[in-house]
Amino acid sequence: MLNQVDLGTKMKKEELKEVLDEKLGYELGRVQRHARAAGMPVILVIEGWRHSRRSEIVGTMMQFMDARGFRVYSSTKFNEEDRRMPFFSKFWRQLPEPGNMSVYRHSWYYLKNAIKVKKENEAVSTSFEHINAFEKQLTDGQYCLLKFFIHMSEEQQKNNEKDIKRTLAKAWRPHDEIYSEVGSYDKFKKCYSEMMEATNTENAPWHLISGDDLEVAKYQVFTTVVEEINKAVKAFTADKAAKKPSTNQSENEKTYDVLSKVDLSKTVDKDTYKEKLEKYQEKIRALQAEAFYKGVSAVFAFEGWDAAGKGGAIRRLTAAMDPLS
């Protein structure tokens, strides 16, 4: 996919500045207000090569938006608490509220790629299938998810690194992040290409950006953000209207008629019940031990009517388990 990006894209600086400062700046603020009014949450993932000036792209974009409506995250590593939780727990906690926006300069993709270059005992574990499933949950939940990758040439990356090292304002930032790409361009290009091929899905496609010229990159990102959020707000609003609860009682009864299909006449005699209870409690005990040694976690959820027997079912289930694990 990266080979499809035209890194030679150029635009006249005067025209580009006018479009960025006036037209696109206004449009970015407008689509943010529209998303807020509709109650649609937005997630922007800004990935790319190291030294592709993503911070400047994000910083410029935020100048045109209401700071009360967005949060910017840069997930470069997991702390000890994060490591004890499922991989995506960190990101679930950072999801924007309805109408708000979360922007990632580094996201779950950065941490996933770190696996290939970090020491094995420091790596975090997930797969592209897990990422696709996570993103499908987001888009199914009506989050507007936009993913960008800032592509650049090896020569431009080296030039940007030199410029950054010369900039005193960058001196506070540690230069030893999870990995350094300079000098390993082909290795990382292969890694990024595999990542995008595996995660370029219909519900969450990648938008590839030409990053050799910073102003062109800003133009491409901002234009796409405006276009995609506009489309997403229209779809979100239409879907919301279609799902508006009906005031017709008979229609509502049909919607929840699934419970009438449950066979409540089923019974089991006491002897059979006792025999099967002991049998399956023994199986549960063995499975718990196996899960413990394999490091597999489990969650059991019980829902139902009051006095339906949920408490009794839980007691019989836990009676077969070791309470310490």
Where are these regions (language model features)?
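Glycine-rich phosphate-binding loop of ATP-dependent small-molecule kinases
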Residues: 1-325
